[in-house]
Regions:
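Metallo-beta-lactamase
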Residues: 1-69, 161-170
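Cap/insert and terminal regions of metallo-dependent hydrolase folds
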Residues: 62-70, 74-81, 85-165
């Protein structure tokens, strides 16, 4: 399998070193705003299914997404979770956030779900898991894919909205 680099532009970490603050574990960056790392074990199987790898010590392995984070806002309606591509699975991310903030309700999740390459039955099973987690609003777009969004919307109804330029979401 060929590999294509899709990470941070080479040289940027060094070029912008003075502007980057590395976070380990949960990091409250302002009152009510927390960065939460992804820690679900076994996500390499999703990396394999999505054909996403990382290079470590000159060798490739399937990505476990342990370097990805969620930005969580503790808002009046409940927790609002933001992600980019949710590579490790938005359903897994919701479970991680629930474990991180016990007793707090997750109101919404916003991000791409990286489902554009998956078969319909995989997307449907994902949407059903998300429904069981009882998140009230799902805002998705980007790498979710149009067909996958159709399936997610079919399962979740108006709880699922497709993101678009100029969209406003109130916390």
């Amino acid at each position: 399998m060929g590999h294509e680099y899709i990470g941070i532009h080479k040289g940027w970490l060094e070029r912008f070193a003075g502007r980057i603050r590395y976070a380990e574990g949960n990091a409250e960056i302002a009152p009510g705003i927390t960065l939460v790392p992804h820690s679900t074990a076994g996500l390499e199987r999703i990396g394999e299914m999505a054909h996403l790898s990382v290079k470590e010590n000159g060798k490739y392995r399937y990505d476990s997404f342990d370097h990805e984070q969620s930005l969580v806002f503790d808002a009046s309606k409940g927790l609002f979770v933001m992600n980019s591509c949710s590579h490790g699975g938005a359903d897994n991310i919701v479970k991680e956030i629930e474990a991180t903030f016990p007793g707090k309700k997750i109101y919404a999740i916003l991000g791409g779900f990286h489902l554009f390459r998956y078969k319909d039955e995989v997307v449907r099973a994902f949407a059903e898991r998300l429904r069981e987690l009882d998140v009230q609003k799902i805002y998705t777009g980007h790498c979710t894919g149009n067909r996958a969004f159709e399936i997610v919307h079919e399962v979740l109804g108006d709880r699922a909205e497709q993101m678009h330029a100029g969209m406003t979401v109130e916390l």
